[in-house]
Amino acid sequence: MNYCDKIHYNIYTTGLATFGEMVDALLAQLPQDEQILRLAFFGMPNDNEQYVSRRIMLREKIRKFYGNHEPVLSYVSQPPLNAGLILEVHSYKADEDDHITFRRHGGFPYVVLENADGRFLFAGGLHGDVINFGIQQQSAEVFHMMGEVMRREGFPVNCIIRQWNYIEQITRFDGPDQHYQMFNNARADFYGKTDWSNGYPAATGIGANLGGILVDLDAAVFARSECYATPIDNKLQIAAHAYSDQVLEAAQQKKATPKFERAKSMTFDDRRIVYISGTAESLVGVGLGRQLHITMENIGQLIGKAKLKMLRVYLKEKSFYEEARELLEGYNLNIPISYMWADVCRDELLIEIEGIAIE
């Protein structure tokens, strides 16, 4: 069976209850006949102390639930707009050709999948000390841990296919330094140690109301010439890594551009999976409907004939939810869609959408 048929993405939701009850309700919905690779919870803690205590509770529940087969675990502080708590699940229907190993490094669980197509790394939930350190120090700490995991498993940094970056108060400044710019500088330092001749990863850089810096990633080293990664550009948009300095805000006068592609695909023989980066359209003075329409046009350009399997929608204002949901229903996608309240990386952006498509 092709990798594209074995990898699955789904979204589960639950109504408002206590945090523990919501987690239990979500875990009860998970598929029993698949290997769970990644669990990403999206919720709304009251402050960073509660965020940390809930993250610890989550980890304890997941360890008890999965034992030695602990998937990657992330807790993202983004208020869900269509649920009390949202769970995004990446799972895999393994066959006799697949070898899956569950490991931990520094307390962080990660998963390695090996088969005839190559080796695949699923890692994440990587975070620093949210309570005691600032964004710059947390960013450096997260990339250091990422490097350690990748070195340990023999994955070069330039084989990252998809990266999710959650940045507390992304457009806020600490003195002259913007949080997003501090993160971009740390990412550029980490990425600068290698050559990216096959393009940067697909990525999302999105605001979180709490939680400091949190990073998830997928990486791949291919074993057959018929399996490979391809960076995808959109002729309608400027490549993010080619932004001018004026787009970003100085962090100690060092302005590294965001290092990501608009999308990246993995091809397996005649099939492919497309990871769509966080996509938005920088239109000043237009409403949500126009931004959403152009964003979906951009996504259509990126995926070609591939079919969307899942979307995440980030909205700048809670009040946009009903309009966004109705507009997307008009596309008749019939796929899982999650809606979160989150700051997008530039003030004029009202909506950002990311997703996964398969052809």
Question: Can you annotate each of these PLM segments?
Answer:
Residues M1-W164, Q169-Q301, K305-E359:
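N-terminal presequence-like segments and the immediate start of the first folded domain
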